[in-house]
């Protein structure tokens, strides 16, 4: 499928999935993946995030499962509002624009508090996630090397 056809299908799916008047759709954020994120702004100013996650490049079922596992642990993650996995389309709740980096650079006096919260969350995920580990691939040497290649590909753009 051509990208232009995919874009039309994606926009149509969004419009059919949201039961409200959409004011606009704008690019949101990006990550080191083939996913694209768009903020959907409704006429009442509510927002959602639409995700275009091509299934030939992304494991969307695993993405949904990890979101459920983290949510079950009490970790703040976007809620899955709707999904169409055959095409890799998702609508998730919008957690806003603020990142930890934003907080660190705008409020240096509390940076140690943010790091403590982050380490606490990582510890919580490590301890609480033990029961779910069999559902996820092992983070072994090969996976770690693959993740390091992502850094080179997406951030350094050397390949």
Residue ranges: model-predicted function:
Residues 20-38:
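ATP-binding glycine-rich phosphate-binding loop
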Residues 16-18, 73, 159:
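Residues at alpha-helix termini
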Residues 2, 138-159:
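Active-site catalytic-loop/activation-segment of kinase and kinase-like phosphoryl-transfer enzymes
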Residues 1-22:
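Juxta-kinase regulatory segment immediately upstream of eukaryotic protein kinase catalytic domains
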Residues 3, 33, 56-59:
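Alpha-helix N-cap/loop-to-helix initiation residues
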Residues 38-146:
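ATP-binding pocket architecture of kinase catalytic cores
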């Amino acid at each position: 499928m051509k990208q232009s056809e995919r874009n039309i299908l994606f926009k149509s799916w969004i419009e059919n999935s949201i039961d409200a008047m959409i004011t606009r759709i704008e690019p949101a954020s990006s990550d080191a993946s083939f996913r694209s994120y768009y903020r959907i702004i409704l006429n009442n100013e509510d927002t959602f995030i639409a995700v275009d996650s091509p299934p030939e490049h992304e494991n969307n079922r695993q993405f949904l499962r990890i979101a459920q596992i983290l949510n079950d642990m009490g970790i703040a993650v976007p809620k899955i509002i709707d999904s169409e996995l055959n095409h890799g389309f998702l609508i998730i709740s919008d957690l806003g624009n603020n990142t930890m980096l934003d907080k660190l650079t705008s409020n240096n006096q509390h940076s140690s508090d943010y790091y403590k919260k982050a380490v606490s969350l990582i510890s919580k995920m490590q301890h609480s996630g033990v029961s779910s580990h069999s559902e996820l691939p092992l983070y072994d040497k090969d996976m770690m090397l693959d993740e390091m290649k992502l850094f080179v590909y997406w951030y350094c753009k050397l390949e």
